[in-house]
């Protein structure tokens, strides 16, 4: 346990996490759990889900365990993430993982404000998938989200850059899920991506300004929750 706590403190510092969950905006709020696994192989991994193809919204897409805030969550988005992760994949906060803190909120294209809670696995859990919500789950090394080998982008409304990772060994991951994975990878691995991160944060920008990982992810945080207004590229 001491080793887990020590590692957790390191990860929290590297991601500049907050002890206080981001606040509900009183609109469309969702909580997700970014669950990390450090197996000692020097390949820090993150858990991702493939949504059930029976769902009406975003069937078959890759996402983090999580969902929309309910009244029972008491306007606490961390509770939302913890509850949804248990309902969807069967992981329990008390037994399976240690909460590290929260990232700032990220806004999805259709207005949902996603509040990520970051956690570190304590032990290998026994996953129990909610068949109606989750088709499958997979662990993927964070390093995959910094390489340009399987990476591409496209623009929405001519201004919003969407990252796409079409892996050979893993399901295709894109959108706000991919962006959050990139941010976590930059912070925890201390490396720059081999591609432009945003329209206003290119490889040249990052290198010319000698930005470190914390400066880069703080730049992303600054823009991540903004509403979609096609005036400036992000």
From Swiss-Prot:
A motif (Nudix box) lies at residues 66-90. The chain crosses the membrane at residues 170-190. PROSITE patterns: NUDIX. It is a single-pass membrane protein. GO terms for biological process: coenzyme A catabolic process. SUPFAM superfamilies: Nudix. One of its GO terms (cellular component) is peroxisomal membrane. Coiled coil: none annotated. It comes from the Eukaryota. The keyword rRNA processing does not apply. It is found in: Peroxisome membrane. InterPro entries: CoAse, NUDIX_hydrolase-like_dom_sf, NUDIX_hydrolase_dom. Residues 27-162 form the Nudix hydrolase domain. Optimum pH is 9.5. Its cofactor is Mg(2+); Mn(2+). Its EC number is 3.6.1.-. A motif (Microbody targeting signal) lies at residues 232-234. Keywords: Hydrolase, Magnesium, Manganese, Membrane, Metal-binding, Peroxisome, Transmembrane, Transmembrane helix. It is an enzyme of class 3 (hydrolase). Mg(2+) binds at residues 84, 88. GO terms for molecular function: coenzyme A diphosphatase activity; hydroxymethylglutaryl-CoA hydrolase activity; metal ion binding; succinyl-CoA hydrolase activity. Belongs to the Nudix hydrolase family. Coenzyme A diphosphatase which mediates the cleavage of CoA into 3',5'-ADP and 4'-phosphopantetheine. PANTHER family: NUDIX HYDROLASE (PTHR12992), PEROXISOMAL COENZYME A DIPHOSPHATASE NUDT7 (PTHR12992:SF24). This is Peroxisomal coenzyme A diphosphatase ndx-8. It comes from Caenorhabditis elegans. The lineage of its organism: Eukaryota, Metazoa, Ecdysozoa, Nematoda, Chromadorea.
